[in-house]
């Protein structure tokens, strides 16, 4: 098992011992290769890393973190250490010019110098304020931000509240998408760092900006992934402390929220009701803040959740529909539950899944995304008939089995700054089952008892699994050939499936049944002519772009 990432945050940047830049004839650069820096992530926290490459054209750096992962980070999200000899150089404008009323002030923690007007909010002159020492905005946020919510008491909590009354960027100058979920500048929250709207962020009802959980000081419990059932107002809009109110949830919202949170944490689609959904809900019952539902007796919670999962077919899919255990449940589309908020005039406004108050365009995880429709197929007594492109009626009323077979969990689209595993802040029941460490491309929780290393539960989805369930590229325990099995080759689907590696070696089972062998396509014609039953077991895409199907004839089982 691969070692889990080891993440580190430094509250005092003055502890760094940065490498010196290579001597040059020009001015000393702010960032260079080999420099130790703090990089702000999509969760609002700072992580220690080393710069590997600097791209001045795009203003990004390739940063290697302590878990040996490397990602591109924007210059604005990188905090380097102060260098000797730069005590009289402003770290914002890179100027030493001093005029009356705009003097240079040094931070007590990081030793960076700021012009009074370059710092947001305006820095006090030396000797002014409550104390003789002064701490900059970067250091205050580095110390006060925490998973689950920032500090609420103490001098740094009070200093952070004062900093949060103004933003370090121009809110009106941000270029937002139609759903007001992401902006081109990747500037969010009070810290100005990157973010992902569905990964533990709150949206202000007034300015519509998104704020990290780690930077807020109003939460009593940690957020779940995709939990937007809050009415939140930021410090900038209120001119003082934040205000938050929990919205009332229905049982269908609870089931949807729990399933979405588990799917993001565990990177799989289906979850066992008795072993995963109900235990997670029960152990975190108080943290869910369910309002009127919180008084529900323990004996009724199971029946209420199960009724919501079974009665809302438009949101949930059960294992019975895909010929698995009936106690398995998953989401039809991995999007957060829809939320109904009150606008400024008091009228309720519904925000469907994947949408925000700024528009009505649905886009999963805040990115533009559209899947190409696949031709519909119909099974008739031993043959698969091609029906051509799907019509609107077929799209709405297609068979449940066909939708279930084609359903797969789409990974979040990567952004320049999306990646770390963090503690979810919620309890998971320890079991004997072990889980794979999360891929460093997503910010997911690391442990959950249902994530198996070998897919033994039958409902997990390894990264290199085809949509129909065949574990491509890994040896299997199944026989290399079967008298009732055949693969049908096709080139009608040229595109690779998400998560499929074009260079993955084929499994021994499919390789032994490729066309031209004793079990080729020609051998299946006789089965079709006799009207024997046929079942498509799996599909794979070969390096040349052709598609092969693993077909079972005669009703025999090989797994």
UniProtKB/Swiss-Prot annotation:
<dbReference type="InterPro" id="IPR047010">
    <property type="entry name" value="PHF1_PHD-finger2"/>
</dbReference>
<feature type="compositionally biased region" description="Polar residues">
    <location>
        <begin position="417"/>
        <end position="426"/>
    </location>
</feature>
<keyword id="KW-0963">Cytoplasm</keyword>
<dbReference type="InterPro" id="IPR001965">
    <property type="entry name" value="Znf_PHD"/>
</dbReference>
<keyword id="KW-0227">DNA damage</keyword>
<feature type="zinc finger region" description="PHD-type 2">
    <location>
        <begin position="186"/>
        <end position="240"/>
    </location>
</feature>
<dbReference type="GO" id="GO:0035064">
    <property type="term" value="F:methylated histone binding"/>
</dbReference>
<dbReference type="InterPro" id="IPR002999">
    <property type="entry name" value="Tudor"/>
</dbReference>
<dbReference type="GO" id="GO:0035098">
    <property type="term" value="C:ESC/E(Z) complex"/>
</dbReference>
<keyword id="KW-0677">Repeat</keyword>
<dbReference type="InterPro" id="IPR025894">
    <property type="entry name" value="Mtf2_C_dom"/>
</dbReference>
<dbReference type="GO" id="GO:0140861">
    <property type="term" value="P:DNA repair-dependent chromatin remodeling"/>
</dbReference>
<dbReference type="Pfam" id="PF18104">
    <property type="entry name" value="Tudor_2"/>
</dbReference>
<keyword id="KW-0206">Cytoskeleton</keyword>
<keyword id="KW-0678">Repressor</keyword>
<dbReference type="InterPro" id="IPR013083">
    <property type="entry name" value="Znf_RING/FYVE/PHD"/>
</dbReference>
<dbReference type="Pfam" id="PF00628">
    <property type="entry name" value="PHD"/>
</dbReference>
<dbReference type="InterPro" id="IPR019787">
    <property type="entry name" value="Znf_PHD-finger"/>
</dbReference>
<dbReference type="InterPro" id="IPR019786">
    <property type="entry name" value="Zinc_finger_PHD-type_CS"/>
</dbReference>
<dbReference type="InterPro" id="IPR047399">
    <property type="entry name" value="Tudor_PHF1"/>
</dbReference>
<dbReference type="GO" id="GO:0005634">
    <property type="term" value="C:nucleus"/>
</dbReference>
<keyword id="KW-0862">Zinc</keyword>
<comment type="similarity">
    <text>Belongs to the Polycomblike family.</text>
</comment>
<keyword id="KW-0156">Chromatin regulator</keyword>
<feature type="domain" description="Tudor">
    <location>
        <begin position="29"/>
        <end position="86"/>
    </location>
</feature>
<dbReference type="InterPro" id="IPR011011">
    <property type="entry name" value="Znf_FYVE_PHD"/>
</dbReference>
<feature type="compositionally biased region" description="Low complexity">
    <location>
        <begin position="481"/>
        <end position="515"/>
    </location>
</feature>
<feature type="region of interest" description="Disordered">
    <location>
        <begin position="338"/>
        <end position="434"/>
    </location>
</feature>
<feature type="compositionally biased region" description="Polar residues">
    <location>
        <begin position="449"/>
        <end position="459"/>
    </location>
</feature>
<dbReference type="InterPro" id="IPR040477">
    <property type="entry name" value="KDM4-like_Tudor"/>
</dbReference>
<dbReference type="GO" id="GO:0008270">
    <property type="term" value="F:zinc ion binding"/>
</dbReference>
<comment type="subunit">
    <text>Associated component of the PRC2 complex. Interacts with p53/TP53. Interacts with CHMP1.</text>
</comment>
<keyword id="KW-0479">Metal-binding</keyword>
<dbReference type="GO" id="GO:0005737">
    <property type="term" value="C:cytoplasm"/>
</dbReference>
<dbReference type="GO" id="GO:0035861">
    <property type="term" value="C:site of double-strand break"/>
</dbReference>
<keyword id="KW-0804">Transcription</keyword>
<dbReference type="InterPro" id="IPR031202">
    <property type="entry name" value="PHF1_PDH-finger1"/>
</dbReference>
<dbReference type="Pfam" id="PF14061">
    <property type="entry name" value="Mtf2_C"/>
</dbReference>
<protein>
    <recommendedName>
        <fullName>PHD finger protein 1</fullName>
    </recommendedName>
</protein>
<keyword id="KW-0539">Nucleus</keyword>
<keyword id="KW-0863">Zinc-finger</keyword>
<dbReference type="GO" id="GO:0140003">
    <property type="term" value="F:histone H3K36me3 reader activity"/>
</dbReference>
């Amino acid at each position: 098992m691969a070692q889990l990432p080891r993440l580190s945050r430094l509250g005092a940047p003055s502890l760094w011992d940065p490498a010196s830049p290579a001597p040059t004839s020009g001015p000393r650069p702010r960032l260079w290769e080999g420099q130790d820096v703090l990089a702000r992530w999509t969760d609002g926290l700072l992580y220690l890393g080393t710069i590997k490459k600097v791209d001045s054209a795009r203003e990004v750096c390739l940063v290697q973190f302590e878990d040996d992962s490397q990602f591109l980070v924007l210059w604005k999200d990188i905090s380097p250490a102060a260098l000797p000899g730069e005590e009289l150089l402003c770290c914002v404008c890179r100027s030493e010019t001093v005029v009356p009323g705009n003097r240079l002030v040094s931070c007590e923690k990081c030793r960076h110098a700021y012009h009074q007007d370059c710092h947001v909010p305006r820095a006090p002159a030396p000797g002014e304020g409550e104390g003789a020492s002064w701490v900059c905005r970067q250091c205050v946020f580095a110390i006060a931000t925490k998973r689950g919510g920032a500090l609420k008491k103490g001098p740094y909590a009070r200093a952070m509240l004062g900093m949060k009354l103004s933003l370090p960027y121009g809110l009106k100058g941000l270029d937002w998408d139609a759903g007001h979920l992401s902006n081109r500048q990747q500037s969010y929250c009070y810290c100005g760092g990157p973010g992902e709207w569905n990964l533990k962020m709150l949206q202000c009802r007034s300015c519509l900006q998104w704020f990290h959980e780690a930077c807020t000081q109003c939460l009593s419990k940690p957020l779940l992934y995709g939990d937007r059932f809050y009415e939140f107002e930021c410090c900038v809009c209120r001119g003082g402390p934040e205000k938050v109110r929990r919205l009332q949830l229905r049982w269908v919202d609870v089931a949807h929220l729990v399933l979405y949170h588990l799917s993001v944490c565990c990177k799989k689609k289906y979850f066992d009701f008795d072993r995963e959904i109900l235990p997670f809900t029960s152990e975190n019952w108080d943290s869910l803040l369910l309002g009127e539902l919180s008084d529900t007796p323990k004996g009724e919670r199971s029946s209420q959740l199960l009724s919501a999962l079974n009665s809302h077919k438009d949101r949930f899919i059960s294992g019975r529909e895909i010929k698995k255990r009936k106690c398995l449940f998953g989401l039809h589309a991995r999007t957060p539950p829809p939320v109904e908020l009150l606008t400024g005039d008091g009228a309720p406004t519904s925000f469907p899944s994947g949408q925000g108050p700024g528009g009505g365009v649905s886009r999963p995880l805040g990115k533009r995304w559209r899947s190409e429709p696949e031709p519909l197929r119909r099974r008739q007594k031993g043959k698969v008939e091609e029906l051509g492109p799907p019509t609107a009626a077929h799209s709405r009323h297609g068979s449940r089995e066909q939708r279930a077979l084609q359903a797969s969990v789409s990974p979040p689209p990567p952004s320049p700054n999306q990646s770390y595993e963090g503690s979810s802040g919620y309890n998971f029941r320890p079991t004997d089952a072990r889980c794979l460490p999360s891929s460093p491309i997503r910010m997911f929780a690391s442990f959950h008892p249902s994530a198996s290393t070998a897919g033994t539960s039958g409902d997990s989805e390894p990264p290199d699994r085809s949509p129909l369930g065949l574990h491509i590229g890994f040896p299997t325990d199944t026989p290399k050939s079967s008298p009732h099995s055949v693969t049908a080759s096709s080139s009608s689907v040229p595109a690779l499936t998400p998560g499929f590696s074009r260079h993955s070696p084929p499994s021994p089972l499919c390789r032994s049944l490729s066309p031209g062998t004793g079990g080729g396509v020609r051998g299946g014609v006789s089965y079709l002519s006799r009207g024997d039953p046929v079942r498509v077991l799996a599909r794979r895409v070969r390096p040349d772009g052709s598609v092969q199907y693993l077909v079972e004839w005669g009703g025999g089982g090989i797994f």
